[in-house]
Structures are given as C-alpha cells and as structure tokens.
C-alpha cells in the first residue's frame, strides 16, 4: 500500500508540476509582451480577455487548429519526436528544483544526492532535440540553425558547469537542498559574484535568449531550426525556448539567491513565496536584457564564450579553491 501511495503522490506531483510550469511560461510570455510593448511605446496584447490576459490561451488554440504540414523530404519519425524531446528536456530540470524546504508538499519532486549533475545532464540532452529538429526537416536553413544552436549550447555549457563548481566547493555538496540550505546566513551572490555573472550569461546563451538568439536569426536563417515546423510542433519549440529562459531565472535563484530562504529576516513569509519573488525578480532582468541589448554576431558569440567566459569561470574556480583551502 505504501508503494502504491508513493507512486500516486509522484504521479500527482508530476502532473501538477507540468501544469504549473506550463502556466508559468504562459504568464512569462504575457508579461514579456507587455514589458516589450512598454519599452517600445506600444500597448501590447489588449484584445483577448480583460487587458489581454487571455492572449496565451488564444495562441495555444490557434496553434492547435493549424494544419500540421510535414515536408516531403523530412524524416517522419525524427521530425515528430524532435520538439517533444526538446520540450521534455527543458521541463525535466524542474524535477529536482527545491521550491520549498524538505518535507513540504510543494518541495521538489525528486531529491537526488547529485542534483546539480542531474540538471547539467538534462540540459545537455536538450541539444538532441534542437539538432535532430534541424536535421530531420532536410532544410538548409534549419540545418544551419541547428548546427549553430548545438555549437552554442556545447560551448556555453562548459562555462556554466565551471561556474557552478565554485558553488559546489563552497557548499561541499552537489545536492540542491544542501546548496540552498548553505545560503541561510549569506547568499552565494556575494562570495560568488563572478561565478553568478558567468552562470547567468551562459544560461542565457543556453536558452538562446537575447543577445544570444543566433540560431534563429531572421535576417540570415529565416527561423533557424524550426523553419519547417508549424502548428503545435512549432508551439512546442517556442514553449521550449521560453521554458529555458524561465529555467535560467529559477536556477540563478536556487544557486545564488538563496532559493526558498527568506531575506531580511522575514521568516513569516513562506519559503515557497520567497522562491517565487526571487524568480520574478530574475525574470524582469531577462525582460530588461531583451529590451536593451542587440544580437551578437555569430563569430563574436563563439569568441566570447571560449576566450572570455570560460577563462573567467576558470579564474573564479581557482580563486574559490584557494579560499576554501586556506580559510574555509
């Protein structure tokens, strides 16, 4: 009976998690449109529902009823699987995110001892959805876009992983809960500020967020690796990109802003609420970046990843190792 109850709880958590993430991404998209419109002196979505709040639902309905056209030269199986692989890899990161302290109903779905490694592994697997999507469509623009996305993800993932090594050294653990609990007195943003900058920039590049949205550069590649995708399959790729952007805010909150730990001694506010407030703060930073920075040139993007970000991450790791060895 206990085994079946455990399985039932996990299934319920998985369904609730998927619904919550999808809802969060829809809200993220709505506010992004409003924010971008405000910066461009426009009004944004206003037609669907009061103040345009139902616009994401209208977008989903529109994509669901669009005709699903597959190119004749495409590989049918891989063409259909690629967006699903990409989306579930983006969604899988949330399985080990500690939303609240251990024992809470809304705590993480899984609590592996090597949670950081699980996140890096799932993030690395997301490359397959992008690469296969561009290759399966047998379109030159899609193939070039997928090659760009794959090279970009692999390049910046090294810097992202190395920036987390400093956090792991200071915490002495690769468990997500241990990393969050170690920030009760002081968040990692201050001792690991260099690591935070590297991680945040690399996570934006992983997500293909501005100014790193080179894989779908409209002036060069039409729409990149999802040029030949339409309907809900295009919607899944679009949802994947937005989920990656939200993942960037969530992981930055967990690793560097203390996760569910309260700030300023305000312990009367639940940890789950603190977590959401910090994520919202990082999300608005994402909006601000998207409104402010132009797109990089592709060669400068790669040079920045290998010759700037990776050495800075290595320098941060060496400095952290010396500090831990001498004073910690």
Swiss-Prot record:
Transmembrane segments: 11-31, 81-101, 116-136, 154-174, 189-209, 235-257, 269-289, 308-328
A Pfam short name: NADHdh
UniProt key word Repressor: no
Record keywords: Cell membrane, Membrane, NAD, Quinone, Translocase, Transmembrane, Transmembrane helix, Ubiquinone
Membrane topology, as annotated: Multi-pass membrane protein
PROSITE patterns reported for this sequence: COMPLEX1_ND1_2
Example GO biological process: aerobic respiration
UniProt GO cellular component terms: plasma membrane
EC numbers on record: 7.1.1.-
Protein location: Cell membrane
MF terms in GO: NADH dehydrogenase activity; oxidoreductase activity, acting on NAD(P)H, quinone or similar compound as acceptor; quinone binding
Catalytic activity reported: a quinone + NADH + 5 H(+)(in) = a quinol + NAD(+) + 4 H(+)(out)
PANTHER family in the cross-refs: NADH DEHYDROGENASE SUBUNIT 1, NADH-UBIQUINONE OXIDOREDUCTASE CHAIN 1
Function in brief: NDH-1 shuttles electrons from NADH, via FMN and iron-sulfur (Fe-S) centers, to quinones in the respiratory chain. The immediate electron acceptor for the enzyme in this species is believed to be ubiquinone. Couples the redox reaction to proton translocation (for every two electrons transferred, four hydrogen ions are translocated across the cytoplasmic membrane), and thus conserves the redox energy in a proton gradient. This subunit may bind ubiquinone.
Subunit structure: NDH-1 is composed of 14 different subunits. Subunits NuoA, H, J, K, L, M, N constitute the membrane sector of the complex.
Family: Belongs to the complex I subunit 1 family.
Name this polypeptide is given: NADH-quinone oxidoreductase subunit H 1
Native species: Symbiobacterium thermophilum (strain DSM 24528 / JCM 14929 / IAM 14863 / T)
């Amino acid at each position: 009976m206990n085994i079946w109850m455990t399985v039932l709880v996990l299934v319920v958590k998985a369904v609730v998690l998927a619904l919550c993430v999808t809802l969060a991404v829809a809200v993220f998209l709505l506010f992004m449109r409003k924010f971008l419109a405000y910066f461009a002196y426009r009004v944004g979505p206003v037609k669907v529902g009061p103040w345009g709040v139902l616009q994401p639902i209208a977008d989903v309905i529109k994509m669901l009823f669009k005709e699903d056209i597959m190119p004749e030269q495409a590989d049918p199986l891989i063409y259909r699987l690629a967006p699903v692989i990409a989306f579930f890899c983006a969604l899988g990161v949330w399985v080990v995110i500690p939303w609240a302290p251990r024992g809470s109903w809304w705590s993480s779905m899984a609590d592996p001892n090597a949670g950081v490694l699980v996140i890096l592994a799932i993030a690395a697997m997301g490359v397959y959805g992008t690469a296969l999507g561009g290759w399966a469509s047998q379109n030159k623009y899609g193939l070039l876009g997928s090659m760009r996305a794959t090279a970009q993800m692999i390049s910046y993932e090294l810097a992202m992983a190395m920036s987390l090594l400093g956090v792991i050294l200071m915490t002495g653990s690769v468990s997500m809960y241990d990393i969050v609990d170690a920030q009760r007195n002081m968040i990692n943003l201050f001792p690991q500020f260099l690591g935070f900058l590297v991680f945040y920039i690399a996570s934006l590049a992983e997500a293909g967020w501005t100014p790193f949205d080179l894989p779908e550069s409209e002036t060069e590649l039409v729409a990149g690796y999802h040029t030949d995708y339409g309907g809900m399959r295009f919607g899944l790729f679009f949802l994947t990109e937005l989920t990656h952007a939200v993942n960037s805010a969530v992981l930055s909150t967990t690793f560097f802003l203390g996760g569910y730990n309260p700030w300023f001694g305000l312990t009367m506010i639940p940890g789950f609420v603190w977590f959401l407030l910090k994520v919202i703060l990082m999300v608005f930073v994402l909006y601000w970046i998207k409104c402010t920075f132009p797109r990089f040139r592709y060669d400068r993007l790669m040079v920045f990843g290998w010759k700037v970000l990776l050495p800075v991450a290595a320098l941060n790791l060496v400095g952290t190792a010396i500090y831990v060895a001498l004073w910690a």
